[in-house]
């Protein structure tokens, strides 16, 4: 089954600290009044232009194995294969905050407002990432809450954890995100730019635990897996 989800822009606003961190301001550092004013203006621009929407498609382990195989360009061994094999439920997703946000960023740059453009870009990036968490919550609620007690749902995306970015093609073929206006270019980059895709895996918290010591981990700049693993105990309690 494939479900479409639509949100209001205000439903997907990221936390200010998260956005400012993307701007290079460390957590715990109080931003200046000017930075706060620019952030507030960026939030207004985001809520005015954002059109957040997503498709969520249930998939079996066997079907996901085919999608994940894609064009055969993945790393020889990846944590995603282990996660999927142990997950109780899987779903593919594609989500976007829409093209109007990116259009507004371009307009701001064209009108010599780089500070607001860069802040809006950070707001939109953080909002797009937040869509994955919202979809995970939706995926949890779609099942019997009693059967999901203590389980954790996390997302994994092409381009990360050994899943080659060309895997987008098989994922898109399965989900059909043209229905929400999301397409791929020849390099497998998504349009609109502020979009996310991947697989949601629901299962006991320990399926998401691994040591990031694969060769491809050396190319990862943010290591968000470490942050997610540190948060697993709290996520398990609320699952």
PLM regions with names:
Residues 34-37, 41, 126, 130, ...:
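Conserved active-site and cofactor/substrate-binding residues in soluble primary-metabolism enzymes
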Residues 146-226, 239:
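Short terminal or interdomain "cap/linker" segment that borders an active site or interface and mediates
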Residues 48-56, 132-133, 144-148, 226, ...:
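Intrinsically disordered or highly flexible coil/loop and linker segments, enriched in small
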Residues 1-117:
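Active-site helix-to-loop segments that bind/position phosphate- or nucleotide-bearing substrates
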Residues 43-50, 139, 143, 221-224:
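Structural signal for hydrophobic packing residues in well-ordered secondary-structure cores
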Residues 229-238:
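Short cysteine/histidine-rich zinc-coordinating motifs and their immediately flanking basic loops
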